[in-house]
Amino acid sequence: VFGAKVEAGRVDRRVSNPIIATPWLTADASEAVLEIPGAARFHVWQGRHVQVQVMPGASASVIRMWLEGMVASLVLIQQRRFALHASTIRVGGRLVAVAGPSGAGKSTTAALLAGRGHSIVTDEVTAVDFAVREGVVIPTVCPSGRRLRLRRETVERLGMSRDGGEEIIGTGKLGFPLVPTDHDELSLELVVVLRPEGGEVVSDVHALTGPAALTALITNTLRPYFCILQHQAHLRWIAGLASAVPIVQLDRPSNRWTGSRVAMLIEEAAMGGRDTDGLRPRHAAESNSTPRADLPVAPLTPSSAG
């Protein structure tokens, strides 16, 4: 998990002076104990080691779900690293992070873009680091190895085969393995924030700058409530990311399917069809769009492995 070694073993540790203290999680900046009733107890230490005590009857797919999500977030925080709650796709050779709250359509959008010939790099968790290249600070993303997780009804709507999708018990979702990328780190070039809205909303994009961009990045940080553990480092990360990458917001209606148009708008923004420094909302009427169910999701590997 992001370089941390994962081992099975009994978890008896307690965090003596926690900054976060809830019935299920105690944590400070370097240590955390997470307890998921009926699933497992996890001890995360210094961002380098994870010990897992699996409860009787817990399925491997559920344990992996927690390792890829909550535990991965704690590992990153202890490493003084941060992630966007985003799926990341290579669109026309450019790396785009599609962020948004749970249920905004991040994974669905990633699958739609994959069906249009693009490659999924990460799903839901996009850890962003900074590298210096020729004197310029560049935000970079490392593939997480996380599965693409889609609801069954989404799989059916997209016309995808369930072959190779592992059921994640208790979630109503299937996990599909992603094709490994041949790069260890990729330059992030655009962040798209999905914003579902009720009513007659036109799907369109507009640039976010200044406080609006900072607020969007803070809101779409993976589990932002964990960032109290590394508050100053998180603020520096937000400022660095906002100054290095265009941030755009994509408004879409929450009451009808607009997946194909959303995918097209992201392609336009990523591939230069629109000026991401000057995007403005449009107010023209939008017709209902329908998914292209005949498109295969090329970057997904049919496999029974989770």
List where the protein language model places each region.
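Conserved lysine of the Walker
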Residues: 106
